[in-house]
UniProtKB/Swiss-Prot annotation:
The keyword Lipid biosynthesis does not apply. SMART domains: Lactamase_B. It comes from Pyrococcus horikoshii (strain ATCC 700860 / DSM 12428 / JCM 9974 / NBRC 100139 / OT-3). The lineage of its organism: Archaea, Methanobacteriati, Methanobacteriota, Thermococci, Thermococcales. This is UPF0173 protein PH0120. One of its GO terms (molecular function) is hydrolase activity.
């Protein structure tokens, strides 16, 4: 499995022969992306939906997201579009994806995605802490978690989320862009202060790793 962070909340997950892009924001450079088969969108805000129409057309990729995203994609002229809700399960080739509700009050249908490939990857989109995340405990190897603190989890709340889910690896996201703050080093210090032991992958935009 390969995971690439393209900045903000945008990731590429390559697993079992399938390339899945998540939340392509407006400033992402599509020319630096690998081929994409599917695009998962967590919610309708433009810092997550941004370049979806362009990238979908360039790759002939299917767009998958909640009702608001489905309607936006149809309005943008896309035809390969699928609507999903929380607590669903679906297949992308040989990869199983599960949806779950996230705590983002300014969105109508905020979703997270649990991608079950060679490893289990959860993308939280925009979210605050939610006790419901306890249901993900034991199901996540790699957690993609926001730390920016503007309409989403702060560094402290991100540690709360990690402590309740207990993944093996964490990739911080959604910080230092579009008015969000957050800092990876202070996030790491908060983890240490709270004695929450997890491997943190501090990626630069367009960097990735294999697991």
């Amino acid at each position: 499995m390969k995971i690439v962070w393209y900045g903000h909340a945008c990731f590429l997950v390559k697993t079992k022969g399938v390339s899945i892009l998540i939340d392509p924001y407006p400033d992402v450079d599509e020319d630096r992306m690998e081929k994409v088969d599917y695009i998962l969108i967590t919610h309708e805000h433009m810092d997550h939906y941004g370049k979806t129409p362009l990238i979908a057309k360039l790759n002939d990729a299917e767009v998958i997201g909640p009702k608001t995203v489905y309607l936006m994609a149809i309005s943008d002229g896309l035809t390969k579009v699928r609507e999903v809700e929380a607590d669903q399960e679906f297949q992308l080739g040989d990869v199983t994806v599960k949806t779950f509700y996230t705590e983002h009050p300014t969105s109508q249908y905020p979703l997270g995605y649990l991608i079950l490939g060679e490893k289990r990857v959860a993308h939280l989109g925009d979210t605050y802490y939610s006790p419901g995340f306890r249901e993900l405990r034991g199901q996540v190897d790699i957690l993609l978690v926001p730390i920016g603190g503007r309409s989403t989890a702060s560094e402290r709340e991100a540690v709360d989320i990690i402590d309740i889910i207990r993944p093996r690896i964490v990739v911080p996201m959604h910080y230092g862009t579009y008015g969000s703050t957050g800092n990876v080093e202070s996030f790491k210090r908060e983890l240490q202060r709270r004695r929450v032991w997890v491997l943190v992958k501090d990626l630069k935009p367009y960097e990735g790793f294999e697991v």
